[in-house]
Amino acid sequence: ITYDLLTHESDILHLGFWQRAFEILRDAGAIRLEDDGKNIGCWVMSLADSPEFADMDDPDKILVRSNGTVTYTGKDIAYQLWKLGLLVDPDGSRHDFGYRRFASWEQEAPAEPVTYGSGSRLLARTTSNTDEAAPGEPYGGGRSVYNVIDVRQAYPQKVVKEAVRVLGHSDAADNSVHFSYEMVALTPGAVREI
């Protein structure tokens, strides 16, 4: 498995990805500002109508805390909308990163290691300077998105998928896959034997 883009989480906030996602969610009625109870002052997404979350005692997910801090799940929703090409500005243009060349690389065969520093393939990184255009084909706008993330993120990834669905993009939600992996703990003795 290889990849061609390193994204900087800070760019999601600096470039207004979350702000735009927030506006889309708010305007669609997918989130609400709590005015009482334990979540007072928080922006929450209600999951009560989703069969996926039907058995939960508290099916509300906080996306913005009362102090204004955006949660990881909120940022993940914005990032997922970008990955799917659904983070669109009011003028119809896609909200996007700036891009900067990071490294070139090559790989002789799928099972061979990647060699950085030479080769024809490019590894780019995001930047908050949107004047720096994508080198080659644009990123984002995928038909399917596979998020390879630790199994401990299963619940937030379900929330991300549901956010895409409640915005009216059922096909995109169905094509949003959390490809989870488990963590392995090795004893020092086991590590020495490896």
Enumerate the language-model features and the residues they cover.
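Alpha-helical recognition segments enriched in aromatics with Gly/Pro capping
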Residues: I1-I194
